[in-house]
Amino acid sequence: MKLNENQKTAVEHLEGPMLVIAGPGSGKTTVIVQRTYNLISKYGVNPDNILVITFTKAAAKNMKERYLSLSDDLGSGITFCTLHSLFFRILRTFSNFTADNLIAETLQFECIDNIIKKFKLEIDNKNDFIKQALLFISGIKTGAIKKEELKNIEYSKYSTLIYEEYQAYLKSRRLLDFDDLMLYCYRLLLSNEESVFYCRNKFKYILVDEFQDICEMQYKIIRLLAHPLNNVFAVGDDDQSIYSFRGANPSIMLNFERDFKNTRLITLDTNYRSGGLIVKLSNKLIKHNKERYNKSISTGSDSKSCAKIVNVNNQNSQNRYIIDKIKDMTKKGYDYSDFAILARTNKETESLISELIRNNIAFSSRERASNIFTGLVALDILAYLNLAYKYGANKTVERSHLIRVMNKPLRYIKREWLKEPIIDLADLKERVVLKDWVFYNVVSLIDNLKFLSSLKPAPAIDYILNTINYREHLIRYAKDNNLSFDELYEQALELKEIFDKFATFEEVFSFIDDYTKKLAEIKTDFSNKNSVTVSTFHSAKGLEFKNVFIINCIDGNIPYSKNKSNKGRIKFDKKSLEEERRLFYVSMTRAIDNLFLTVPRFIHSKDKIPSGFLDELR
């Protein structure tokens, strides 16, 4: 690759601190690799004295492979590693720390799962809850969340409990997680002169990729290691700082020149990835942020890009538009792998994934795709549908389904009355004949199931919510468990939209079986390279696709707020709004040729306002 002037300046840099502000698609990896090669081949630096830090194992592996493609014989001795790997090496060398002391990710999940079971915590989606729990534990340790702020976190009534139980679990087994690794490493370097002397003597040239993603503690460790030579070559983009929940903060990058005297500043401001229109619009957006280096990115791509705001009626029409567009564009020569569908949250992708499966479009998910049919509300509604279907067929029902919803809403039916795996509801009436009010409730349930069995799937959900009064149960459940009723209710409405495509309960059950099987395959099989990528904004960072769909570009979602409002625009504090704008900027700049921003007019029949960020693109 031929280097431009700014890239050359960065690559030729030898000593002293340098901050490279690298915009999207500006060739930052090439610059890091070429500069590493130059240090050895041109300036004679000992490879053993070079440390290249990345944020993921995949990035470290890629960086090393890119370097070795330039020079096999000059590659030996360079340390390519993640920050966590670096911390582990230091602790292993200067303390009794071993790999056995580090908790595995699977064990972290198991730990939180056991806490849920131990305290019988009432939660909706267990996988999402565990991920969020581990995030706020990390947030406390990295300083992104203060302990006193726990009350403001979703599932706040469990936050302190989970944190304390998790820490007790680690302590009892003499284990550390990755955040502990960082803290222990910092303390070691401060207290053990031999360790810091060794590291400074070995790592005389430090190159840091994705510098905008580091937290304060990681920054302190880098400064400790770099002193007094301060040969730090930091590469990042303040406009792509999107991990505040991990403690990342653009101010770290903005203060680099203050912390490292005589810093040279270079801006890589040519985007070789995206076409001109996409670059122009993303520039317009990000310039509304104030906490940033002032820069304007230009395009170095010959791609004739298209960027388009697509207004749709609702989520169903949004899904239909995306499916039809993918089918049409693949006929014109694009592969499935040329497409990405990006969402602000993982939950938003559930109904879209069901449509991809229904249309036999291969896809891969950057996250562990959650199954929309395994949520608390979905399981209740499916139990009602199963009861109605079985009762309509032979007047009997399965015990497991009846137990799940027999008191949703409250009917005072007791579990001990249901001993057989298959329940005859006529027999159940006889068992409660002496309890008039319960007898009436059972008769009412039988009548409801009988009528429910005659309905199509979508109207059946309306009947469950309003006539059977499951809606009232959700109101009480949300109140008792400090959850959002609106979010629970919307899960039911989302099921209704999915079921609207089916004429019978049999079709629904068959589709759910197929959906669950294919979802399980997606979790374990990433061998199919020709597949549409479904991802959140965060997980798409660093990737690129010829065609990108950004869904649900509506207020309250982009920018995102847990506290949705139906009256006017949601208000954000400046810091949160700027991070959300950076996140939208990152998602837009994943696109090479075509960018589609879809805007539903309604979500579950509720009127929605287009994202305020769309106004900033005009």
What positions do the PLM features span?
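Helicase C-terminal subdomain and adjacent C-terminal extension
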Residues: 601-618
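ATPase/helicase motor core of nucleic-acid motors
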Residues: 259, 303-305, 334-457
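Accessory C-terminal helicase-associated subdomains
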Residues: 393-398, 431-539, 543, 560, ...
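Conserved helicase motor core of SF1/SF2 NTP-dependent helicases
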Residues: 26, 208, 212-284, 295-300, ...
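N-terminal pre-P-loop "Q-motif" helix
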Residues: 1-15, 217
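Conserved helicase core region in the C-terminal RecA-like lobe
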Residues: 79-87, 207-210, 235, 345, ...
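Helicase P-loop NTPase motor core
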Residues: 20, 24-32, 261-264, 269-362, ...
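A basic/glycine-biased coupling hinge at the interface between accessory DNA-binding modules
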Residues: 15-16, 37-189, 193-194, 201, ...
